[in-house]
């Protein structure tokens, strides 16, 4: 079945408002986690043209492993507490980093990444990974991104 994404213009909030029901439609009736993660990353990349967007999933109690993503080649494994992703996982909270060069222990998978937001991904109350979104511009992410990306992640917790 072919799926078309309606790309919207307008403010960041308007774009998320338009995208949210489309992502919900993509996920409805599909139980395969990899397929759903892949469609979420593709939709976010298509709508916002983020430099990199993808998931890391818990592989062992101390390591995340790369999952579906859109963008340049990425780091394959990230230890708990390392970099933005590992820290967000360890702390189980969203991290917004306006300038990745100023984040202690930042893992530079790409020198072109300038700012980042990482959100925990939950399944039935347990953290199973993180959503990582990178921009090639400084200060790209804010509370609007956090609000809507959190809503998108809640759609995956079914």
Swiss-Prot record:
| Record-annotated GAF domain positions | 32-158
Which parts pass through the membrane? none
Any one cellular component term from GO for this entry?
cytosol
Q: Which GO terms describe its molecular function?
A: L-methionine-(R)-S-oxide reductase activity
InterPro entries from the UniProt entry: GAF, GAF-like_dom_sf, Phosphatase_reg/MetRdx
Classify the source by domain of life.
Eukaryota
Concerning PANTHER family, the annotation shows:
FREE METHIONINE-R-SULFOXIDE REDUCTASE, GAF/PUTATIVE CYTOSKELETAL PROTEIN
Q: Which family does it belong to?
A: Belongs to the free Met sulfoxide reductase family.
User: How is this protein named in the record?
Assistant: GAF domain-containing protein A
Organism source for this protein?
A: Dictyostelium discoideum (Social amoeba)
């Amino acid at each position: 079945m072919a799926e078309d994404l309606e790309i919207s213009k307008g403010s960041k909030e308007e774009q998320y408002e338009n995208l949210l029901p489309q992502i919900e439609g993509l996920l409805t009736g599909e139980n395969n986690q990899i397929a759903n993660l892949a469609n979420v990353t593709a939709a976010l990349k298509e709508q916002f043209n983020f430099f990199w967007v993808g998931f890391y999933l818990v592989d062992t109690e101390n390591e995340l492993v790369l999952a579906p993503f859109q963008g340049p080649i990425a780091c394959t494994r990230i230890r708990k507490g390392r970099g933005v992703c590992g820290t967000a996982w360890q702390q189980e909270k969203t991290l917004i980093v306006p300038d990745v060069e100023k984040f202690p222990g930042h893992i530079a998978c790409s020198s072109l990444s300038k700012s980042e937001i990482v959100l925990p991904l939950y399944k039935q109350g347990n953290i199973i990974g993180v959503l990582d979104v990178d921009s090639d511009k400084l200060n790209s992410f804010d509370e609007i991104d956090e609000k809507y990306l959190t809503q998108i992640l809640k759609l995956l917790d079914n």
